Design a protein with these regions (language model features):
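Core catalytic lobe of class I
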Residues: 2-102
Length: 102
């Protein structure tokens, strides 16, 4: 993995531009307010899969507020009932609910 410089800070990144780390840890490693849009599909905790464990929401929102610009956007994919939990966990940042019909 090559180190690249972003606003004077070194951020681990692959050649393809992908950050290879825990999402919360990754957001906190970025320069403050350096992200225009965060698009993520976090685990919902609605299955019995070992990896499907909901993120600690307080830590998640702290990381989002750190990395995303004040006028930036944070978009989360989620399914019911986790979408309600996620939205209610930070009403101050909740703006819209978009529904993707497949």
């Amino acid at each position: 993995m090559a180190d690249t410089s972003a606003l004077g800070q070194s951020v681990p990144k692959s050649q393809e531009g992908l950050f290879l780390m825990d999402g919360i840890e990754g957001l906190l490693s970025l320069p403050r307010h350096s992200v225009d849009m965060l698009l993520t599909d976090p685990p919902y905790g609605t299955t019995r899969n070992y990896w499907d464990v909901p993120l600690p929401l307080d830590a998640l929102w702290e990381a989002v507020r750190w990395a995303v610009k004040p006028n930036g956007a944070a978009l989360f994919f989620a399914q019911c009932p986790y979408d309600k939990v996620l939205g209610a966990s930070n009403l101050a940042m909740l703006r819209y609910e978009w529904i993707w019909y497949k």
